[in-house]
Amino acid sequence: MKSPICSFDAKSGVLCSKCEARLDSAAISQDDVDASIKLTKIADHSQEVNKFSLIRGVRVDRDFVLVLRSPDVSVVRGSSQITDTIESEFGQKVWFVESEASDRRFIENLFHPAKVLSINLVWLPDGSKLTKVVIAGNPKLRLDVEKVQKIANTVRNIELLVEFESSK
């Protein structure tokens, strides 16, 4: 498994001087270190997870966001057992997003399995931009819109405005 810290550190849970220096210089975060250690622990028992490439980990409130390569996210989406194992190890809800995805694909990943109908960029008079997302279905879906907005802002600095369009 590839991670932001070296494999020995991920297995031992103690950072070498090189990784410690990267942490001190903010090249990596404590969340990256925590995610690397926990995923490596799972990778010891799971061949699929052992093939993952963790790009970074981000803690958002009580949830954790794992930024992985696209094929790794596909593997996770295809196996609820892997998702359950990872969430059990982390002890919290874990979100999976693709590292090399466009902003549109990133937003679709966050709203998965809900269907995203449209994504539009809205420029505000003060020069800032807002991304308007229209989701198919009912706003009463089991979808934590505020959490998705916070994750998008934290991970990619995208401000979301979410609307629902019900089918008629």
Regions flagged by a language model, labelled:
Residues 53-59, 84, 119-127:
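Short, flexible, solvent-exposed loop/turn segments with mixed acidic/basic and small polar residues
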Residues 76-90, 141-159:
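Short, non-transmembrane amphipathic alpha-helical segments
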Residues 104-118:
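Short, low-order "capping/linker" segments at domain edges
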Residues 114, 119-133, 157-166:
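Long C-terminal interaction/binding lobes of large macromolecular proteins
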Residues 1-77:
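Terminal low-complexity, intrinsically disordered regions
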Residues 58-70, 125-138:
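Short glycine-rich, basic-tinged beta-strand/loop micro-motifs
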